[in-house]
């Protein structure tokens, strides 16, 4: 993270103020303030990672994934014979908090702050899948997009999407 001296001073002061406003996290803010004031490049890079930017395409893929899971749920609920797919397989796992943190943060923003997709967001561990899921969801989306009726899926189409 490249910053001018003035920018570092402003950011350091912001961290100091946050520590005063949020005593429960004062140590974290004090550490960040020390890093910024000191200009410690290695630690600044780690701080910069807290501000991962998502491209429009990445945001859209997360939204499309949520929409796909909504379609899977709606389609499953409309089926008369549900024996071939368990409801557990239709649960959205989320994203890996370690390797896919930026996607998980966006997911939490969409579902928490924006309040969208609440009807089926019952993931365990705060939607931390504890394993990378991006590639799996991308493959599932490819299959879903090729289905002629995205929200009226047959049991075979549901299975094909889940098995992608």
UniProtKB/Swiss-Prot annotation:
SUPFAM superfamilies: YfbU-like. Disulfide bonds: none annotated. Pfam families: YfbU. Signal peptide: none annotated. Belongs to the UPF0304 family. This is UPF0304 protein Asuc_0543. It comes from Actinobacillus succinogenes (strain ATCC 55618 / DSM 22257 / CCUG 43843 / 130Z).
């Amino acid at each position: 993270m490249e910053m001018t001296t003035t920018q570092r001073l402003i950011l350091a002061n912001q961290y100091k103020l946050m520590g005063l406003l949020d005593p429960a996290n004062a140590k974290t803010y004090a550490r960040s303030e020390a890093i910024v004031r000191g200009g410690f490049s290695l630690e600044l890079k780690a701080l910069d990672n807290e501000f991962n930017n998502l491209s429009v395409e990445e945001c859209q893929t997360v939204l499309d994934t949520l929409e796909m899971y909504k379609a899977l749920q709606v389609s499953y609920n409309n089926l008369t014979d549900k024996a071939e797919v368990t409801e557990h397989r239709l649960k959205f796992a989320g994203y890996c908090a370690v390797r896919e943190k930026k996607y998980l943060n966006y997911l939490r923003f969409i579902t928490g702050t924006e309040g969208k997709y609440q009807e089926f967001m019952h993931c365990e561990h705060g939607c931390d899948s504890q394993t990378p899921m991006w590639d799996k969801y991308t493959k599932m989306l490819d299959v879903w997009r090729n289905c002629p009726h995205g929200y009226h899926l047959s049991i075979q189409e549901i299975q094909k999407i889940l098995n992608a």
